[in-house]
Amino acid sequence: MDKRTRLTNQIVNGEYFMFLHIPGQYPTTSQESEAGFRLARASAFECWSEATLASYAQDIAEGMHDGRNFMTEKYARIDNLIPPINTSPLIHKIVAIEVNWQEGLRSKYPRFFKQGAGGSDFATYLRSELETYSDRTLQSYFQDVSRAQEEGRNLAGERYLKMIGRLGYKSIEDYERKLATEQAG
């Protein structure tokens, strides 16, 4: 197993443990399907640099050691039940770039996004998740996002492509056509 795969597995395992221990007032569909959770999260992490993966794996290990549950914190932030966890200005910058990428995809693939990918509260969800990251991980992820933007890439599209590829589709367009056929029939 290569280092990226090992780090991704370590992260997904830690996150899934945290998801299983989210208090009852924060039910999530991901808790209902371990396979779906692992698919979505691993697909996202495949787009991260090895440095960002290593940093976030360290965050997960340190958080678990300290008794933190990033998933509980994230959902509490989404519902504005706790004050901001991290106020780094990088969070706003990352969210702005990611929202722009999402909007471009949403207009290009309306059926895919109607299925729940990148819902209307995407910015709140992302901001709440980013607040659980260490400053070290935020800096590394910001470098990943900035590099992708400079190269004209869309990391959101790359994440979705990896996810639907794991489901057996060749492209987002291929999946969008499948959804159009289902809706027409």
Positions of the model-derived regions?
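Short, structured motif recognition centered on aromatic/hydrophobic residues
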Residues: 45-61, 90, 94, 130-145
